[in-house]
Amino acid sequence: MVSISNVSKGAIIRWKGEPHSIESLVHRTPGNLRAFYQASMKNLKTGRNVEYRFSATEQVDVIVTERKKYQYLYRDGEDYVMMDTETFDQINVPEVAIGSASRFIKDAVMVDIVFADDGSILEVELPTFVELEVTETNPASKDDRATSGTKPAIVETGAEVNVPMFIQTGSIIRIDTRSGEYMDRVKK
């Protein structure tokens, strides 16, 4: 157990019996009240975001983690099958561990898997950006190209992304896996 004041952003703690990742931690001292830490956390089992106010002296249980590189192989029902690139062992990863970024996973992509000290999977981190081919989008007319609007496009993984009007079917685009937003077009 350590004091909340010694915990930083990105740490994984056990809070109310479940693992949580600290997304942000801000120290506040309002007027003549006692200091506290305002924490924004992500429950790693359910994927839900939680806000909590810790007292400045509160103790939390920090989980010791191990990070390993894995390669995505294929989907098996609700699970994603990943392979350890060193030992070639395969593991099944539940979709909830990957979160909303699962819609951008394509074959052979490398991911970081964070394991707890008991061997359970806490989270799966995809690369920040992925390059995917647009498989379906409405063709842009001459009038559309002059304006700065967006249109929906389906990429090779089946995800829908809003793209600029000049993007056509067959274009390769870069997508931010954290937000699901179009970043730019990849030149070949």
Swiss-Prot record:
Disulphide bond pairs: none
Compartment list: Cytoplasm
Pathway(s) annotated for this protein in UniProt: Protein biosynthesis; polypeptide chain elongation
GO biological process, one term: peptide biosynthetic process
Function: Involved in peptide bond synthesis. Stimulates efficient translation and peptide-bond synthesis on native or reconstituted 70S ribosomes in vitro. Probably functions indirectly by altering the affinity of the ribosome for aminoacyl-tRNA, thus increasing their reactivity as acceptors for peptidyl transferase.
Name this protein carries in UniProt: Elongation factor P
PROSITE patterns assigned: EFP
GO cellular component: cytoplasm
PANTHER family tied to this protein: ELONGATION FACTOR P (PTHR30053), ELONGATION FACTOR P (EF-P) FAMILY PROTEIN (PTHR30053:SF12)
Name of the gene encoding the protein in the UniProt record: efp
InterPro entries: Elong-fact-P_C (IPR015365), NA-bd_OB-fold (IPR012340), Rib_uL2_dom2 (IPR014722), Transl_elong_fac_P/YeiP (IPR020599), Transl_elong_KOW-like (IPR013185), Transl_elong_P/YeiP_cen (IPR001059), Transl_elong_P/YeiP_CS (IPR013852), Transl_elongation_fac_P (IPR011768)
Molecular function terms, GO-annotated: translation elongation factor activity
Keyword field: Cytoplasm, Elongation factor, Protein biosynthesis
Annotated family: Belongs to the elongation factor P family.
